[in-house]
A protein has these predicted regions:
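N-terminal accessory segments
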Residues: 1-34, 40, 59-67
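N-terminal glycine-rich flavin-associated loop
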Residues: 12, 35-67, 85, 89-135, ...
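Conserved PLP cofactor-binding pocket of PLP-dependent enzymes
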Residues: 70
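Internal maturation/activation junctions in enzymes
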Residues: 137-139
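Beta-strand-loop-alpha "switch" segments that mediate conformational coupling across diverse proteins
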Residues: 145
């Protein structure tokens, strides 16, 4: 998609509460991740809610534009980059939504895609619980990115990937 098609994103700007960017600098900044690849997107969207994400998907479907979810952009497989719409969850959708302790060594949590692994580590500090996937990008890896790529780390051989 070229710069001449930027005006189609005006329609999307009227449907989402989050931020939408088509400028060259921001597109360049989102053209790479932790891999060796560089692919410049047509648009970057920072959604503020799941309703925003629904509208982005509807828009992308209507115009047959690919979507690429992005967390911290620390992955090594190129999953966070692409020529279509990059949906960056780190700016607004980055909260823990709930936590339930099951026992001293078990619990569950619900979070938005931009919630960082390091924030969960800090939350669990002092307890006997931990999240064993332990990606190499450590504290700034996001759960959306980790789940989207089935990330793993040093403990994955014993406990499995995300």
């Amino acid at each position: 998609m070229s710069n001449s098609n930027e005006n189609i994103f005006d329609e999307l700007k009227n449907k989402v509460t989050g931020d939408i960017y088509t400028d060259k600098i921001r597109r360049y900044m989102h053209s790479t991740d932790g891999s060796i690849f560089r692919v410049e997107p047509a648009c970057i969207v920072y959604p503020k809610s799941t309703d925003d994400v629904v509208e982005i998907v509807k828009f992308a479907n209507k115009y047959q534009i690919s979507i690429h979810s992005r967390g911290a952009g620390s992955g090594l497989c190129g999953a966070a980059i692409g020529r279509g719409i990059v949906i960056d969850f780190c700016k607004y959708m980055n909260n823990m939504l709930g936590y339930e302790k099951i026992s001293d060594i078990e619990g569950t949590f619900t979070c938005e895609p931009g919630y960082k692994y390091g924030e969960l580590e800090a939350f669990l500090k002092g307890s006997s619980m931990w999240f064993p996937a332990a990606p190499s990008s450590g504290e700034y890896a996001t759960f959306g990115g980790m789940y989207g790529t089935n990330a793993g780390g040093g403990y994955s051989v014993k406990y499995g990937n995300v």
